[in-house]
Amino acid sequence: MKKAVFLALFLSSTSFCWSQSIKLDDLKINEIQVIGSHNSYKKAILPEVYSYLSERDSMKFLPRIQYEHIPIPEQLDLGLRNLEIDVYADSKGGKYAHPKILDLVKTTQPFDPEKKMSKPGFKMIHITDIDYQTWYYTLEDCLKDLKKWSDAHPDHDPVFITLEPKDGKANSFGTEPEHYTPPLFDDLDNELKKYLGKNKIITPDDIRGNYKSLNEAVLHKNWPKVKDAKGKFLFVLDNNSENRDLYAKNHPSLKGRMVFTNSDPGTPESAVLLLNEPQKDLSKIQDLVKQGYIIRTRADADTMEARSEDYSRFEKAKESGAQIITTDYYLPSKLFKSRYRIGFDKNSYERKNPVLTK
C-alpha cells in the first residue's frame, strides 16, 4: 500500500514538475523558488543505537536528529532541486572507519562492509561516531551517482547543492575531524571536476563574466536563464567563518573556484547567502533577493515543525522569496506520527519566485 501511494505521488509530481519546468525556462535561476532536502544523504539512526543513546540523552538532543531521507536519485526523481551534503576530510583514510558507538552497542547491520571508509578521500556522514548511517560513505560515490542521474536526465533544471565542510573540536568519544586547509579545498574542487565534470557545474567564473567582481555581476542580475542552466549543478559552501575564508584565499571573487561561498553582502565574493530564519529575517531576505542574491533558507529544523505540524516557518520562507527552501519532510516522517509535509501546489517542488515574478 505504501509503495502504491509513493508511486502515485511520484507519477503525479513528475508530470506536474515537467510542465512546471517548461514555464520556468525563460526565467533566470534567481527568479525561481525550489524546495530541497537538508542533510540529503542521511539514513535513520539504527533502532538499537537510538535506544541506547536515548537512555543517556539527558539534554534531549536525540529527537532533533530523528529524520531520514530516501536515496538522493529518488529525491531528484521526485522533483527536489536542492541537496545538502556534509563532507569530512580524510586525507590518510580510516579516520571515521569505526564509529565508536559500535564498541558499546551491538547492531544487526554491518558498517561499511566494503571498507570504503578506510581509503583516503572525502567522507559523508552527519555526526561522527553517533549519526553515521549514510547513503554514501564517500563524496566520490555521491558525485558519480549525481552524474549518472544527470546524464540520464540531461534536460533537468539546475540543482543547487550546499556543501558543508565538517571539522572542529573532538567529540565526546575523542574523535577530532581533520581540519580543512587551502590544499584540501583544492582537492575538494578537483573531486567535483573529476567525478561530476566541470561542464556540469555553474561556477563563480561563469557568473562573474566580464564584471570586475562576482558581487558586481550578481547585483547586475548576471545569472543564466533556467533553459541555459539545464543539466547543471551549483554548489555553495555552508560556512561563514574560517573555512569560507580559507576556501576564498588567493581566489579573489572566487576566481577559478568551483563553489560559491556564503560571503557577506557587498563583499567581492558575495553571491549566494544562507539565512535560515525566514520569520525573523523576512524583510532582509526579500531585500537581498530583489538586489540579485540567491538565498537559502529553511522550512523546518530539528524536527520541531514536523512534530507540531507547524507550517508558519514554511509560509514565511515562501513569502521571503528565498530561492532555496530546505526541509527534512518533502515526504511525511515514518519515524514518528506526523502528517507534516512540505511542497508547493500540486505536489511540486519548484515554481516561479513570488518576489521577483508575477
Residue ranges and their predicted role:
Residues 1-21:
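Bacterial Sec-dependent N-terminal signal peptides
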Residues 20-85, 89-358:
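Catalytic cores of phosphodiester-bond hydrolases, prominently lipid phosphodiesterases
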